[in-house]
Each structure stands twice: as structure tokens, then as C-alpha cells.
Amino acid sequence: MLARLRRDIPKLISLAGPLLIGQLAVITFGVMDTAMVARYSADDLAALAVAGSVFISVYVGLTGVVSALAPIAGQLFGAKRYNEIGEEVRQGWWLSIALSIVGVGILSHPEIFLSIAKASPEVEAKAVLYLKIIAWGLPASMAMRVMVALHNAVSKPAIITWLQISGLFLKIPLNAWLIYGGLSLDAMGAPGCAIATVIINWAWMLSAGLIIYRGSFYQIFGVYDKFSPPDTHKLWTLFKLGAPIGLSYLIEVTSFAFMALFIARLGTIALAGHQIVANLGTVLYMLPLSLSIATSTLVSQSIGADKPTLAKEVAWSSLIFTTGICVTVGLIVWIFKYPLLDLYAPPEGVKESAITLFLFIAFYQIFDALQVCSAFILRG
């Protein structure tokens, strides 16, 4: 067992490291939005919490479906059937377009979800505006997720990581300008975050597409070799594999995120406290998620190479390692809960509301690790 762990863990870390950095860069968008809006007003922070819970549920559910490309492309890569990967990517883009239409429709008419929150008219108006703005970035996000799946499948996550880090550095000045105003622009508060995110989503998509078009490594896949109309058989295969993934993502995320809609009934302070804790919980989730994505990549490549025994060994090594890491993280969160909360610099009332929830964040780390790692092993 120890020999197996010593063999498999370095491979996991080499893949999961760039994934984790990239995921944290993306999640830092949310941390940054929360921290910067918290300094603007409690109403805007509450609007961000309500709108964010709706957006993340839609986004994660839909991107979960297109993530089915990763194990398919991973098995083709492991089997050295490189020329078939390009067609799968093209069909993935068609699927992303169809799903984007659904997602944009939901985000553009969010009133049915926001009615659950029973928030004040001011908070609801800002939440609606946030969602209608960020809907413009969803098609780019969906297309980008197809390219992320491709890079994960062929063990090239670092390229996406660099794009995500670049986006983070662009997000900081955009957020400051759009949230607080300046240079003849009025302060926008929470909706300003949405505009910044939309700009970066489109920049990411165009940059990733250009890298695939120009990079010599990708030429063997033939992604841009020809135009492919929608193939109902391939689309159905992708959707059939991806729908359970998207549904599992949706259930997991909404069980936590949609709580914001119910907590909104308790008032702005309670909702703002929940937003901070939910935000921190999302950041912590990136560690088991990155390790699990790396596991899925190695498992799918091993299966494609007709090495089922190796796939099983990698799966067990990852399950043990990921769970151990997350137990340690849970303990650290509980011990350092006050310094972690102080990073958000919330008002005293919000701080008191948030601190009581830290025990739950620390406690569920072990179950999160077991669940997400097992799920990605099965998807591989």
C-alpha cells in the first residue's frame, strides 16, 4: 500500500497542483466580490448572496453536463486515438450552446427563485440586475468549460491555470472601478462585479480558443480541421453521461447555495454572514475537487490504455490521500476560525452571525472528500 501511495501521489499532485491554483484563482473572484462588496454596503452584499446562489446553481449544473467530455477525451487520449478527440470537442461546443440558451433564459427571468428569499425591494432589484448582466457571460463560460475538459483530459491543466491567474489580475482593477465608481463612472455595487466577470469570461474563452488553434501540441487532435454539424448520437452520448454529473453537482451546490434564499427571510445581517461562510466553504472545496479531477484524468487514461488494475490502484490511492488532506484542513479551519473570518473584515453583527457556522465547515470536510473523490473515480 505504501509503495502504491508513493507511486501514485506524485502523479496526483503534479496534475492537481495546477488545477488547484487555477480553481482558487476562479474562486478568488467570489472571495474578492464578497470582500469588496462587503465594504460597499450590507444591502449589496445581501443582493450578491441571493443572486450568487441562483447563478452558481445554474452554472454548476450546466457545466457539470459538458464536463462529461473529460473522461471521454481522457480514454481516447489513453488509447492514443488522438484524431477522434477533435470531433468530441466540436460536439461539446454544440452541447454548450444548447445548454447556454437554457441557462440564459433562467438567469434573465429569475423572479421565481428570488421570490423564495422575500428580500427587500432594494436587495431584489440589485439581485435581478446582477443576474441579467452575468447571463451575458454564460455562453463564454460554457464554451470555456469544454476547453477546460479537453486540457484536463490530456494532462495539460497548467495552460488553463495561467489563463485563470491572468483573469484574476484583470478582475481586481475592474472590480474596484465598477463597484466603487471612478473616472466618470458612478458606483454600481454588486452589479459591477457581474460586469467584470462577463468581460473576463469572454477574454478567457477567446484566449483558450486561440491557444488550441495556434499551439503545436493540439494539432494532432484536429479541433479546427473541419466544421461539424450537430451529431445527435454523439450529443446524446455526451448528455447521457453528463446529465447525472450535472444533476449531482446541482443537488450538492443548491443544498448549500439555495439556503441563501431562505436565510434572506431572517434579514440582511444573517444573509451576509451566511454569504461569508458559504464563500469560505467553496474555497476549501477546491482542494478535494482538484485532486478528484486529477484522479478522474488518470483513471480514464488508464482505462483507455486497457490497464484496469492500474486504474483501480490510482483510485484507492487518491481516496486515501484526499480524505487525509481534508481531515487536516477541517482541523485547521476550526482552530483558526477567527483569523479566517477577520480576512473579510465584516461588520460586528455579520461576524457574530458567521462564526457559529464555522463548525459545520470544519466537520463536513471529510464527507466532502469521500463523496467528490468517489464520484470522480466513477466518472473516469
PLM features per residue range, with description:
Residues 45-104, 108, 141-160, 273-337, ...:
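Small-residue-rich hydrophobic transmembrane alpha-helices
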Residues 27-46, 114-121, 177-188, 250-283, ...:
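Helix-terminus/linker motif at the lipid-water interface of multi-pass membrane proteins
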Residues 4-35, 39-40, 53-72, 96-104, ...:
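N-terminal transmembrane alpha-helices
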Residues 14-33, 133, 137, 144, ...:
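Transmembrane helical elements of multi-pass membrane transporters/channels
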Residues 42-53, 127, 131, 194, ...:
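Small-residue hotspots at the loop-to-helix junctions and early N-terminal turns
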Residues 1-16, 73-139, 183-243, 299-364:
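Short alpha-helical transmembrane segments in multi-pass integral membrane proteins
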Residues 19, 23, 34-35, 52, ...:
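Transmembrane alpha-helix boundary and packing residues in multipass membrane permease domains
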